[in-house]
Structures are given as structure tokens and as C-alpha cells.
Amino acid sequence: MKNILYSGKVRNIYEHEDNNKLYIETTDRLSSFDKHICNLENKGKILSLICVFMFNKTKHIISNHYISHINNILVVKKCIPFKIEFVVRGYITGNTKTSLWTHYNNGVRNYCGIQFPDNLKKNQKLEEPVITPTTKDIEDIPISKEDIINRNYMSQT
């Protein structure tokens, strides 16, 4: 692999010999709540195989950047990344500063553009699953659907 272009919480991106491609290395680094916790043997390989499975399973729905892989290294088409992470939540739970319950317990009723009612209890099942997007950066910040569009992460079309 050539020069490293980016080192994230879990993945590293390297130049490829072909300027239209990149290498994405999924490491064994375990990250939680925007912090590196430890290394977990074979985590990178397993995550890469899950990605390969999902890219292949969904390519008939939407094109993706996947070309090939060897162990924990993907070869991908160079493209512009979509720096939004989507979390699907079925319960109002958690105990960290980033958890839905922590925000709710501190009085936040509009989270990621979703209005939550009063009187929810910790660990309560939500009436229906909700999607709570966050920015993908050093620190993941909650963002609403409207802000995703207004900040030009994506268009409405």
C-alpha cells in the first residue's frame, strides 16, 4: 500500500497505484462513544466481510464503491464520502453523554429533528423505530434531516 491519506477511529485509507481507486483498511481498533478502547483480534477482517456482504447484497438497489477485498483491506473506487452516520433506535436507553436517554433525561424533546413526548421511561420501547443521524467526524454530532440538506451533506432529490 502507498501513502496513508486518512486515519479514522476504525479505518485507514491509503493511496492506490491506480489514482481512481483507494485501499480501505479496517483495523482491529475498537471504538465506542468517539473513543478508542482497545484492539480486538480479527475485528477488522470480520467488519470487512460484513461490508463486502452488504455491498454485494445491495448493489442492485444502489451502486457502491466496492471492487474487491483481501482479508481486512477493501479496494474501492475513489469517490466523495457521505459523512453522515445513521443509527436506528428501538428503545430510549443509554448512559453516556451521546445516548438518546441522556439527552432526553436532560430535557431534550427534539432530538435529530424527532419530537419525543414527555414521560418516557429509561429503556422504554419506542412506538416505532427512529433514525437518528450524526455527523461522521472526530466527534459525532446529532443532526436533523433538515440540517443534512441545509448544510449540503446531500440534496433533497
Regions found by a protein language model. Give the residues of each.
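Active-site loop/lid in soluble adenylation, ligation, and acyl-transfer enzymes
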Residues: M1-D137
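A short mid-domain helix/strand-loop element embedded in enzyme catalytic domains
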Residues: L126-T157
